[in-house]
Amino acid sequence: MASSMISSGTVATVSADRPAPAQARMVAPFNGLKSSSAFPVTRKSNDITSIASNGGRVQCMQVWPPLGLKKFETLSYLPPLSSESLAKEVDYLLRKNWVPCLEFELETGFVYRENHRSPGYYDGRYWTMWKLPMFGCTDSSQVLKELEEAKKAYPQSFIRIIGFDNVRQVQCISFIAYKPAGF
């Protein structure tokens, strides 16, 4: 702000004696792209029924029912996955070079907060690992075989399949593969 206090005559003599400082050579600020008249514009309706692709038979979209159904994890809104669907999911994580692993929970497979009180994705549950992660697994049938063994050993447990990226050292996918009767 000192530059605004000096007189204009002083500025003229300073600029005549030496080159102008970098501040005097500032470029005008960026004002954005060219006017929008050069670009074609389409106006879209905000009507949600225009998004539906079922011939307009839908007036509104149904959400998860709040009563009687517990929220589990990824894919929990779908009906129980068949062996073929599970094999496709496992094939996907194998194609991504993730390491499959099975975990089980004997009491509650749904989301709740016990050991962790802050909001967010992680809810503080601890699942028990079924054997070791399946490093070197190349076929989804190997994972499904382990899933069947886990079901026989713990028929009243929730069993999930996770995909672990051992390069980034993060869990990339997790979904419930088996729920006990009554869930």
Curated annotation (Swiss-Prot):
Assign the protein's first listed, main location to one coarse class: plastid
Disulfide bonds listed in the record: none
Q: Which GO terms describe its molecular function?
A: ribulose-bisphosphate carboxylase activity
Q: Please state where this protein is localized.
A: Plastid, Chloroplast
Mind telling me where the transit peptide is? Answer: 1-59
What are the entry keywords? Answer: Calvin cycle, Carbon dioxide fixation, Chloroplast, Photorespiration, Photosynthesis, Plastid, Transit peptide
Its BP terms in the Gene Ontology are: photorespiration; reductive pentose-phosphate cycle
- Subunit info? Heterohexadecamer of 8 large and 8 small subunits.
Q: What else is known?
A: The basic functional RuBisCO is composed of a large chain homodimer in a 'head-to-tail' conformation. In form I RuBisCO this homodimer is arranged in a barrel-like tetramer with the small subunits forming a tetrameric 'cap' on each end of the 'barrel'.
Q: What does this protein do?
A: RuBisCO catalyzes two reactions: the carboxylation of D-ribulose 1,5-bisphosphate, the primary event in carbon dioxide fixation, as well as the oxidative fragmentation of the pentose substrate. Both reactions occur simultaneously and in competition at the same active site. Although the small subunit is not catalytic it is essential for maximal activity.
Q: What is this protein called?
A: Ribulose bisphosphate carboxylase small subunit, chloroplastic
